[in-house]
């Protein structure tokens, strides 16, 4: 046997320590300028990029906390839930989609409404939540938006709705389209009574919501660079077969 036969070379061990994984949610990338931002610092700027002024989408709960005086907002209508009147099914049943949206947001529907105060002045407020099925307007959302305006009418206080929606909820068919008329009628009653309605247009505000109450404010306020219109660019491109 030779001198070095049967001799095994020792395996080299790396001196590098395994890098610990970065906890999820510490950083967020700006969709506009591409900067990597600390989530905690974004809270200080109210979810606005300090480099390019891009406005990140906010949940309905976050918007309420930003707008309302502390502990002044009295939520209502949380027990309202939609059904599946058309027994709608596509890739998933409507019932399954509702359960998934509930699990994702913790809300029974895509709109929060209630009475609260802004700098001491009482207002009737509705806030739409894009995280719940794209903020689409179904029967429950239509009922809540109408409630916001009806409460403003009864209490003689301003109505404010923060719009954030892809439009009418297709899973509810004609019942969702009826909400366009319902909400517009409630808004008209406010106008006749001389009670102000402020519509805040955030990204995105499109479809049946844009074609109804969202554009009917005495004052319409839009976030910078928000997508606002009846049809979004993807729908238009698919319709005309051209790139915008």
Language-model features: where?
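Long, charge-dense tracts
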Residues: 4-5
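Residues immediately within or flanking Cys/His clusters that coordinate Zn2+
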Residues: 27, 46
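Short cysteine-rich clusters marking metal-coordination/redox-active sites
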Residues: 30-33, 49-52
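Cleft-lining beta-strand/loop regions that shape enzyme active-site pockets
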Residues: 110-191, 198
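Conserved catalytic cores of soluble enzyme domains
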Residues: 163-244
């Amino acid at each position: 046997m030779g001198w070095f036969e049967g001799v095994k070379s020792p395996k080299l061990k790396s001196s590098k320590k395994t890098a610990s994984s970065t906890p999820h949610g510490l950083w967020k990338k700006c969709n506009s300028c591409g900067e990597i931002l600390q989530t905690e610092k974004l809270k200080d700027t109210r979810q606005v990029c300090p480099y390019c002024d891009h406005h990140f989408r906010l949940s309905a709960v976050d918007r309420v906390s930003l707008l309302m005086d502390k502990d002044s907002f009295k939520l209502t209508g949380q027990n309202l839930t939609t059904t599946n009147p058309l027994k709608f099914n596509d890739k998933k049943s409507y019932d399954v989609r509702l359960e998934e949206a509930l699990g994702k947001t913790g809300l029974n529907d895509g709109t929060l409404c209630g009475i609260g105060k802004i700098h001491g002045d009482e207002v009737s407020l509705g806030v739409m939540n894009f995280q719940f099925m794209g903020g689409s307007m179904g029967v429950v959302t239509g009922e809540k938006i109408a409630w916001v305006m009806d409460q403003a009418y009864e209490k003689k206080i301003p109505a404010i709705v923060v719009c954030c929606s892809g439009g009418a909820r297709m899973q509810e068919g004609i019942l969702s389209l009826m909400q366009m008329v319902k909400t517009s009628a409630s808004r008209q009653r406010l106008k006749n009574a001389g009670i102000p309605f402020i519509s805040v247009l955030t990204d995105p505000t499109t479809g049946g919501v844009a074609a109804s109450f969202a554009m009917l404010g005495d004052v319409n306020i839009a976030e910078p660079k928000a997508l606002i219109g009846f049809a979004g660019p993807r729908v238009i491109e698919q319709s005309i077969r051209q790139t915008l």
